[in-house]
Structure formats: C-alpha cells, structure tokens
Amino acid sequence: MLGIVKMEGHETTDWSNYYQDTQEAYSSVPVSNMTQGLASMNTYMTMNPMSSSSNMTAGSFNMSYANSGLGAGLSPSGMSGMGAGSASAMNGMGSGVSSMGTALSPSSMNAMSAQQASINSLSYSGMNPGMSPMAYGPSNMNRTRDTKTFRRSYPHAKPPYSYISLITMAIQQAPSKMLTLSEIYQWIMDLFLYYRQNQQRWQNSIRHSLSFNDCFVKVARSPDKPGKGSYWTLHPDSGNMFENGCYLRRQKRFKCEKQQGGKGSQDGRKDVSGPSSPLHRVHGKSSQMDSSSSMSNPSSSPQSLEHNGSNGEMKPQVAAGPSPLSSHQNHSTHSLAHETHIHLKGDPHYSFNHPFSINNLMSSSEQQHKLDFKAYEQALQQYSSYSGGLPGMPLGSPSMAGRGSIEPSALEPTYYQGVYSRPVLNTS
C-alpha cells in the first residue's frame, strides 16, 4: 500500500522509471486506453498455461500488478479526463475483466486441477499399510470382544494351600481334634470344589504328607469306636505351626525330639566303640596294623597287654621273632616305594620331610645311591640329543659304568654347568 501511495503522489512521467520491464509497463493508462491494457493482460494470461504451481504463481503475481494498475487508472487523478465516453470505456473494462475471468476459469486450469485431484486421491485407504499406521485403528476399535469360555470358573480354581495346611485345618476343626483318612478326604472335597476331580493324585499326596511329617501322629482306634482306619491327630509338641491363623505358609517346621535323641544315642555308641586314645587318633592306621599283627602272633602274652593298658597307652607288644605278616608288609612297602620312584623323574637332591617320603621309606643307603645314579642316567639320555653326548665319555664307557668310582662333586648341580646349556637336575 505504501508503494501505491507513493506512485499516486508522483506524476505520470515518473512511472516509466518505476517499472523497468517493458511488458508490465502500464504507466499511461487513461480511461480511453484501458481496454487495450486489459486485452494485453488477457493475452498474457492466456499465453502462459497454468500447468504447474510456478506458472500459477507468476499469473497471480501479474494479476496483482494488473489490479494495481487498474486501481491507479481509476484514481481521481486518472478519472479527471473521463468524459462522455466513460460508459463505453467501462464496458470495455468489463469485457476485459470477463475475459480475465474466463482465463482463470476451471476450464483453463485443467492441469492444476488434475494435479490437485491426484494429490487429494492419496488417502490413507490407498496407501501401503506400512505408510499409514492409523489405517488399522478403526478396525481395532470397532472389533467386538469375543466372549471366552474359561475351563473352570473361580470357585473351581486350585486353592493356595499346601497339603499340610489342608490336613491341619481339617484336624483342628474337628471336635475331637482327630480324623481318619477318609474323613480328611471328605472334608477337603466338601470345602474345595477343585479337589472333587483327580482324586487319585492329591489323595496320594495327602497320605505321603501324613506319613513323612512328624507333626502328624497316628492314633489307634479304641474298642468303643469300631471302624476301619486309624485316627490322625496333631503332635502335642508341634504347637502353632501356622502363626496368626495364616495357612498359606508354614512358619516353622516341627521335628520330633525323640527321634533326634535316638539318632544321637546311636552316634554316641559309635563314638564309644571307635578309637578314643590319643595314640589311635595320631597313628590311626599304623596302630590298627600293629594290633592286627599282634593278634595274629600267638606268642604275645596277655600280661603285657594288661600292663600297658594300666599305663593308659594301648601298645601291644610283638614277639621278638618276625611274623610272616610283618615281613610281607615290609616287602610290599619297599616294592611300592621302588615303583613310585621310577615314575617320579624329578630332582634327586630334593628331599621331602614328611614321614612317608621316598627317602624315609628306603631302608638302605645302597638302594638310594642306585636310584640316584639311575635318575642321572635318565637325565643324560634326555639331554644327549641337545649336546650330542660328552666328548670322550660315551654312555656305555667303562668309566660311566663304574658308578662307585664317581666323585662326590659330580653329584652337585654345578658339576655339569659348563658342559650343558641347560641344567641337568631340572628334568621336569
């Protein structure tokens, strides 16, 4: 509007400078030439087909200039020259506007209307279900909920009580505080509808619960109450296993003290019959072997046993003559030690301090030296592949065969240090 006001303030000669484009220059728009301007605008609008949105924008932009020019032409300054021929000029203007209206009619906008129709045709119903997530909404909302038929209703559901809880409830509600097995079954079936089916399964569980729990005690029938089956009642020392009347979970487990006492007495008897003296506790296996050897030896006197028993030490004396059993044990011990030493290929100078070591089990020093030389021979055979053997001293030489003439310094680890790149004693 400010531009229009400024254009009205200037003279008609300055308007040619304001509009630089020759096609849109409507500076001299008298009333007599208004029809020619509108006709040129009509031809300009009809020459540009409105097949796209860009052409439509250009047409609307040119139409706005036409309206501004039209408004300027109809201003009071431009109307001053209007005379008797104003009616004919206005008729020409009306025809020009009508032609412009026909140019802007839907018949000339077929391309744009077709494009708009194609855009409007892209509804959610025609889209891919992955592109229109709301397409499934109405179908889900309009679906009627299916009425499901449950297998059993709520009263037929399994009760949240254990079998011990059911038995305890049945016994506690009885006037005599004891019931037979059939009465317990009947009470459970009357109270809970779930247990009216599959009776074979849960009745077996009831019997197992009665038999393997110390809180239930079987009471024999009295002569004044004939019938079948014994009575079951709660143990008098069981107390209140279900605190605050809550049978959902048993708070404490009852164990009969009499059975525990019987087990403890049996364990005590086993301890008494077992070895009790310090000698047996320290030398358990050796004392048993010595006692067995003394029992097998008939020459041992009972007086010596009584004398040793009075001193508080159980040391059975063995006769001076060696028994066949003891000699057999010594022979087996030596053979076992010999086999063990063959399998062990470690450092022969490493000594074990415990009493069952190989060095302590070997009786003679000669056997010890033989085993040491055997270990060295195995070590030399193992490392002969790396060094190619000693120069001038093969393994089968007489000097190597004479094991008794080897100096004691040869037994030291530093003796072979200059000969081999690796120490001989570390065979593992």
Curated annotation (Swiss-Prot):
Give expression by tissue: Expressed in the endoderm of mid-gastrula embryos. At neurula stage, expressed in the notochord and in ciliated cells of the epithelium. During tailbud stages, expressed throughout the endoderm as well as in the notochord and neural floor plate.
Q: Which Pfam families match?
A: Forkhead, Forkhead_N, HNF_C
Per UniProt, the ranges with Basic and acidic residues bias are 257-272
Q: Which Gene Ontology cellular component annotation is one that this UniProt entry carries?
A: nucleus
Just give the chief location class.
nucleus
The alphabetized UniProt keywords are: DNA-binding, Nucleus, Transcription, Transcription regulation
- Ranges for the region named Disordered are 257-337
For bias type Low complexity, the affected ranges are 286-304
| Single Gene Ontology MF annotation | protein domain specific binding
**Skewed-composition ranges (Polar residues):** 324-335
Q: Where in the cell is it found?
A: Nucleus
From what superkingdom does this record's organism come? Eukaryota
Keyword Repressor among UniProt keywords: no
Which InterPro entries did the record assign? Fork-head_N, Fork_head_dom, Forkhead_box_C, FOX_domain-containing, TF_fork_head_CS_1, TF_fork_head_CS_2, WH-like_DNA-bd_sf, WH_DNA-bd_sf
- Write down the DNA-binding region ranges: 158-252
Q: What does this protein do?
A: Probable transcription factor.
Indicate what this protein is called per its UniProt record: Forkhead box protein A1
What organism is recorded for this protein? Xenopus tropicalis (Western clawed frog)
